[in-house]
Amino acid sequence: MRMCTPIRGLLMALAVMFGTAMAFAPIPRITWEHREVHLVQFHEPDIYNYSALLLSEDKDTLYIGAREAVFAVNALNISEKQHEVYWKVSEDKKAKCAEKGKSKQTECLNYIRVLQPLSATSLYVCGTNAFQPACDHLNLTSFKFLGKNEDGKGRCPFDPAHSYTSVMVDGELYSGTSYNFLGSEPIISRNSSHSPLRTEYAIPWLNEPSFVFADVIRKSPDSPDGEDDRVYFFFTEVSVEYEFVFRVLIPRIARVCKGDQGGLRTLQKKWTSFLKARLICSRPDSGLVFNVLRDVFVLRSPGLKVPVFYALFTPQLNNVGLSAVCAYNLSTAEEVFSHGKYMQSTTVEQSHTKWVRYNGPVPKPRPGACIDSEARAANYTSSLNLPDKTLQFVKDHPLMDDSVTPIDNRPRLIKKDVNYTQIVVDRTQALDGTVYDVMFVSTDRGALHKAISLEHAVHIIEETQLFQDFEPVQTLLLSSKKGNRFVYAGSNSGVVQAPLAFCGKHGTCEDCVLARDPYCAWSPPTATCVALHQTESPSRGLIQEMSGDASVCPDKSKGSYRQHFFKHGGTAELKCSQKSNLARVFWKFQNGVLKAESPKYGLMGRKNLLIFNLSEGDSGVYQCLSEERVKNKTVFQVVAKHVLEVKVVPKPVVAPTLSVVQTEGSRIATKVLVASTQGSSPPTPAVQATSSGAITLPPKPAPTGTSCEPKIVINTVPQLHSEKTMYLKSSDNRLLMSLFLFFFVLFLCLFFYNCYKGYLPRQCLKFRSALLIGKKKPKSDFCDREQSLKETLVEPGSFSQQNGEHPKPALDTGYETEQDTITSKVPTDREDSQRIDDLSARDKPFDVKCELKFADSDADGD
C-alpha cells in the first residue's frame, strides 16, 4: 500500500482543501496599480501572442517572438524598437489548413514557438506555420530570414495550443513537443545533423505529457568522474503507476545525456539515457498534494555549488485556487537517477497499481547512466558500445521508483485564491550579508508577486499590476546584468518591462524598513529609499533591517501637517495615504482614539476619516496612525497629521438693521457688519461675504425721512452657489425643458392623428369640417358614401307600420333584394342629415349621447 501514497494524499486533499486553505493566505504588503508605477511597454498594432522572449545581455537586446513576427528591442528600454521581421503564412497554406477543420483566423497562422541562439550572428526560429511547422535561421546583422525552410516536425508543435519546450545546446536543439498533426505522439528529441535522437513511442516513456521547461546542466570542470553534460526536461503526464476511473496527473523530471548516440541494435536512434522520476511538492501536515507542474526556473549563482531549481505547482483539483512553489537541489535529482531503484510493469488483479518497485538484479553498466570514467575504464566509450541487456532494461524500465523531494520537505510558498503561471528567481545579498532568494511569480490576472522566505515564513513584499486588462502572463524573463536589473513579462497583447524594486515609492524610513525588501535601503543624507543594485555609492550609512525593526530609523523632527478650515455644521474628510495591506489604520484626536462606530465619525475606504456635523469642539489636531505586526512586534507609525479649525458664523444683529446672510458650501468665511441708520448718515455696507468668488453685496440706500421711528431693514444676500450646485441646477432646467418639449410634441402628434381619423367631439369635428369645406370632394368617396346610404337608410314610416314600434336604422344584413335597391330613392344631403337627426333623437342606444356621427362625412361640410 506504500505505492498508493500519492493517490491517498490526492484524495485527502479534497477533504481538507477548504479547511486548510485559510492558513495559506500570505497577503502582499503593498499593491501597486498599473498607473502608480513606471512600467515600460512594447506592443505593435495587430500583432499578438508575445510568448517567446530571448535576452542578449552582451548586446543589451531583447528578442521577442510573436504571431508571424520577430522583434529586436532595446533591453534597457523596450519601447525602443530596433529591428523587425515578419514571417507570414501564404494563402495557399491557410486554405489547406482550413480544409482540415482549423480556424483560418486564429489557428492557421504562424505562431513563433522556438527562439534560440544559434551563433553570435544568427537565431534559430521555428513557428507553427498553419499546422505545417517550419524552422529558419535569422541573420542578426541584416535581421532577415535566410530561407532555410527546414522541417519543424518534432521541433515545434503543429497546434499553437499544444505544449512545448526547447533549449539550444552547442548548436543542437533539444525539444519536447508533439510529433504529428493531432498531437497524439509526444516526443523528446535532439535535432542534430549527425546523431538525431528521440524517445521511444511507448506509454511507459511518455503518457500524454504537457511539457513545461528544459535546460542544460554543464558538468563540473573539476569533476573526477569525467561526467557528461545533462539536459533536463520538466513536464506533467498521466500516471502510468496507477489506473483509476479518472486520470491522475504526475509531475515529472526527465534526464538525457548530451553524449548519448543511441544504441547499435536496440534503441537505434533512440535515447539510451532517458530516465524520469516523480517530483514531490506537498504539505505533509495537511495532506495537500500539488501535482500539476506550471513552470520551472533553474537558479545558478556563484555562491551555489549545485544549481537549485524552483518549480511552480497547482493541485489537480484546484477548486479554491491554490498555488505552490517548491525548491529542489539538483543533486537530489541526480542521486535518484544515479543510485535510485527502478520500477517495472506488473499485473495485479483487483488493484489500481500497475507499476511496482523492481528488486531484481540490475545489469552493468547501469542502465540510463551517462558515459563516465568508470564506463570508459570498462571499455564502454560510447552508448553504441553498450550491451543489449543494458539497453533492453532501460527500454523497459524508464521510470524510477524513488522521488525527488523538495528542500526542507515543504513548499517555499503556498498562496490561495490565485493561479500562478510563471516564475523567475534572483539571489541577492542584504546589507547584513544574508543571502535571499527573491521569487518573482506572475498570475493569470496580469499581476507580479515578489516574495522571499524569512525564518520559515514567506513574505510577499509587493504585488504589481503589469497589464491593465488583467490578462495572463505567458512568459517571464529575468536580466542578470549588474546595474540594470529588470523583469520582462510577455502576454497576448504585449511585453512589459519592470524594475526589480520600486524603492523610491517608499517615502519614509519606516516604510523602507517595514517593506523588508533586500533590494532597498534608506539613505539618511538624501532622505530617500534607494535601490542597492542601482547605486554605486558605499553601503555605509544606509539603513536596512530585514527583521522589520523600524526603531533603527532616526527620530523624525516635528512632522509636517495640513491645516483645514471648515464651516460650522458641515462635514470634513481627512485623508490618510497608507499603502500597507498588513497595517491597521486608526485615528487619534486630542490623544484619544476615535471609534468609527460613533455616529459622529466614519471611515471612507477604511482609511480616510469623515467627521459629521462639525462644531467648535471638533477643532484640533487629528493624527492617522498605522499599526503593523512584524515578528510578534507591533510597529506604530504616524502616517498623516491634520489641523482642523471650525469657523463659527456669528448670529446677525437685528437692531436697528437686520442683515440675513445665507451661505452654501462647507468651506466659507463670512463677515457681518452692522450699520445704524440714525439721522441722515449714509448707510455702510451691511454684509460682506467672502468665498472663492469674493462676493460683496452692500444694501440699498435707505430713503431719508423726518420720521424718528426706527425702521427694520432686512437685507437678503443671494445664496452663494458652488460651481457644482449651479451645474446641477442648470442640468435640472435643461431636463425639465426637454421633458416639456417631448410631451408637447407627443400631444401635437396625437391631436393631428385623431383629427385626421375623426376621433374628436362634435365641436372639433365641425371645426374640422369648416376647415375642409373648401376642398374638392373625391369622386370615389362620394360614390362609396352614396352606396352606404342606399344600403343603410330606410323609410321610418314603413318601419313603424310593420312593427308598431319606433323606427330604427336598418342594418346591412346582406339580404337586400333587387326590388329594394331599384325602388330606393337617393336622398339629398339635407334629407340625410334631417333623417339621421330624427333617428338619433328617437333612439339613443344604452342612453349614451353619441356625439360621433358619420365622422367621415363631416369633411364634406354640413
Curated annotation (Swiss-Prot):
Documented effect of changing residue 395 to E: Strongly reduces PLXNB1 binding
Signal peptide: 1-21
Domain of life of the native organism: Eukaryota
Span of domain PSI: 502-551
Compartmental location: Cell membrane
Signal as UniProt keyword: yes
Entry GO terms, CC: centrosome; ciliary basal body; extracellular space; GABA-ergic synapse; intracellular membrane-bounded organelle; nucleoplasm; plasma membrane; postsynaptic membrane
PROSITE patterns: IG_LIKE, SEMA
Keyword presence, Disulfide bond: yes
Domain Ig-like C2-type: 554-636
Gene3D superfamilies assigned to the protein according to its UniProt record, in alphabetical order: Immunoglobulins (2.60.40.10), ligand-binding face of the semaphorins, domain 2 (3.30.1680.10), YVTN repeat-like/Quinoprotein amine dehydrogenase (2.130.10.10)
Modified residues (Phosphoserine): 833
UniProt feature, compositional bias: Basic and acidic residues: 827-837
Role, per record: Cell surface receptor for PLXNB1 and PLXNB2 that plays an important role in cell-cell signaling. Regulates GABAergic synapse development. Promotes the development of inhibitory synapses in a PLXNB1-dependent manner. Modulates the complexity and arborization of developing neurites in hippocampal neurons by activating PLXNB1 and interaction with PLXNB1 mediates activation of RHOA. Promotes the migration of cerebellar granule cells. Plays a role in the immune system; induces B-cells to aggregate and improves their viability (in vitro).
Family: Belongs to the semaphorin family.
Name of this protein: Semaphorin-4D
Organism lineage: Eukaryota, Metazoa, Chordata, Craniata, Vertebrata
